[in-house]
Design a protein with these regions (language model features):
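Glycine-rich phosphate/nucleotide-binding loop
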Residues: 9-33, 122-126, 130-172
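Short, active-site-adjacent cap segments at secondary-structure transitions
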Residues: 3-6, 81-84, 117-120, 134
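Glycine-rich phosphate/diphosphate-binding loop of Rossmann-like nucleotide-binding domains
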Residues: 44-115, 124
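Predominant activation on well-ordered alpha-helical scaffold segments within soluble catalytic domains
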Residues: 7-10, 25, 52-59, 63, ...
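Conserved beta-strand scaffold positions in the cores of enzyme catalytic domains, especially
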Residues: 35-37, 109, 127
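N-terminal loops that bind phosphate or other acidic moieties
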Residues: 1-15, 20-52, 63, 72, ...
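Short, flexible, glycine/charge-rich loop motifs used to bind or transfer phosphoryl groups or to couple energy/partner
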Residues: 26, 115-116
Length: 172
């Protein structure tokens, strides 16, 4: 239960002073590194300030986990053009842009990130609301499971495939 987990964590760890509501963070593998997403289900609806805070929280997490000095932060949207997105994402982008321009900022804001760009290595942290983030999480899990089953079926199809699988096993 996400809500119970979040409540328990807040009780033990407390909240950062400037954070309204914490988000659930997940790190996804990419071909060359990882991408950190926040929020993945704690806040189904949120305000622009919360969405911007998810970007900052994700940057802190990414810095601690991966040692990146200035993580590249983006907001998940339906396109990369500034005119895309919703009122929520456009307002959050404005807040993150201002925060990244501050002299003490420790992240770079890159703007919108499309779903197709989550795993291409151009972004380190993706901020999203919990509703959308949870859909991304469940979709990624489903795709990973489907691809695993398809590869497994192809590798066990016949004798030649099984030999190929045996040769490929150390790399997998």
């Amino acid at each position: 239960n996400s809500g119970a987990m979040l409540s328990h964590c807040l009780f033990i760890l407390k909240r950062l002073p400037a954070v309204e509501r914490p988000g659930i963070v997940q790190v996804f593998p990419t071909p060359n590194a990882t991408v950190t997403m926040c929020d993945l289900g704690a806040n189904v609806s949120c305000k622009p300030t919360m969405l911007a805070q998810f970007g900052v929280l994700g940057a802190h997490y990414d810095r601690a986990l991966n040692g990146r000095s200035r993580p590249r932060v983006g907001v998940l949207s339906n396109g990369t053009e500034p005119s895309k997105g919703t009122k929520l994402t456009r307002a959050a982008c404005e807040l993150l842009e201002k925060a990244a321009a501050h002299p003490e900022a420790d992240f770079d804001f890159i703007g919108y990130v499309e779903g197709s760009g989550l795993f291409d290595g151009h972004v380190d942290v993706v901020a999203t609301d919990g509703f959308t983030g949870n859909i991304v999480l469940k979709t990624a899990e489903g795709v990973a499971e489907a691809v695993t089953q398809m590869v497994k079926a192809a590798m066990l199809k016949d004798t030649r495939s099984k030999l190929g699988a045996l040769l490929a096993k150390p790399a997998l």
